[in-house]
UniProtKB/Swiss-Prot annotation:
Cofactor, free-text remark: Binds 1 [4Fe-4S] cluster per subunit. The cluster is presumably bound at the interface of two monomers.
UniProt family annotation: Belongs to the NfuA family.
Signal peptide residue numbers: none
Keywords: 4Fe-4S, Iron, Iron-sulfur, Metal-binding
Assembly, per entry: Homodimer.
The protein's name in its UniProt record: Fe/S biogenesis protein NfuA
Amino acid sequence: MQKIMISDAAQAHFRRLLDQQEEGTHIRIFVVNPGTPNAECGVSYCPPNAVEATDTEMQYASFSAFVDEISLPFLDEAEIDYVTEELGAQLTLKAPNAKMRKVADDAPLLERVEYVIQTQINPQLAGHGGRITLIEITEDGYAILQFGGGCNGCSMVDVTLKDGIEKQLLSLFPGELQGAKDVTEHQRGEHSYY
């Protein structure tokens, strides 16, 4: 695994915090409930006596980040930044693989499509309280999807399917997928986004 990308601003922020701690203290980056929909990433102080033999050390300009053995694969492609805005500054930690372990490029098509749905598409739909589930991939190359949450019964579901999800899947899996189809029995209700 490559080193977690920590921006210069975030490194400076960590250095300021670490300067107020006991000498030899570094940071720990971790995932609670990795590989589940409830996965949460975090950063904490890591005093010298808290380093485990199985930890991976990632060295930066003025400190190290330690990652435990279980969290490590779920932090692949993670990025940490320190963003300053009008209302203040905040640390952002993006870990696209925290909820689902990255699949190999040569994994079966079903697994690769499921990975994209869980790490790229569902996080976008979650803003509207929605999600999709991959039911199957047909022999003729169609991803059969079921919409849930705020997407179920939403009047914009056809646009979301064709202009959003299908376009994204076809661009990522050219020649492997022919399209996406919805098998949801839509029932409009208060849960529907539009």
